[in-house]
Amino acid sequence: DSGLLAVSVESFRDYELKNAWTWEHQALTRARFCAGDSDVGRRFEEIRCEILRLPRELAKLKEEVVAMRHKMYDAHALKSETEFALKHDAGGIIDVEFIVQYLVLGYAHQHASLTGNLGNIALLRMAGELGLIDPQQAEAVGNAYREYRRLQHAKRLSAFPKAPIPREGIEQHVAAVNDLWKAVFAN
């Protein structure tokens, strides 16, 4: 069965604390209350921050984030030498988002500011300022993400919104994202 799931706020908290998968916590890094009772929204945000600020074993977290990324890559990546799928290819949007999600989940217990509703570029910059990643890499990947989103928005207005783009012209962005991915997940 599928459909809208309605549970109490405390049941949601209990599930997130005891049963949620890592990918569900990754989704919480992006989740925001947007409509409804403001008390429920406030409580949701408290729970979201509580969950994101839990200490985690970094090696296990890395393993789970990388495994999920591999599943997505295997299912959706273009894997072309001349064309690039902005969202799914290695060095693309999902890699940036997974890096940020890992940094939030891995370090928010030490740096609560990582749970703010700031966006990926600001969170990359903050991670650089906190010494979690190299600040120059943070800036380069932030620039890559900004360009990817610009290209993604332009494609959505075109007749072919899901078509890949040429790799030519974005190689430096792909390389920057791949370099940060290796720096974060290779050790």
Feature annotation, model-predicted:
Residues 1-187:
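A nucleotide- and high-energy phosphate-metabolite-utilizing enzyme signature
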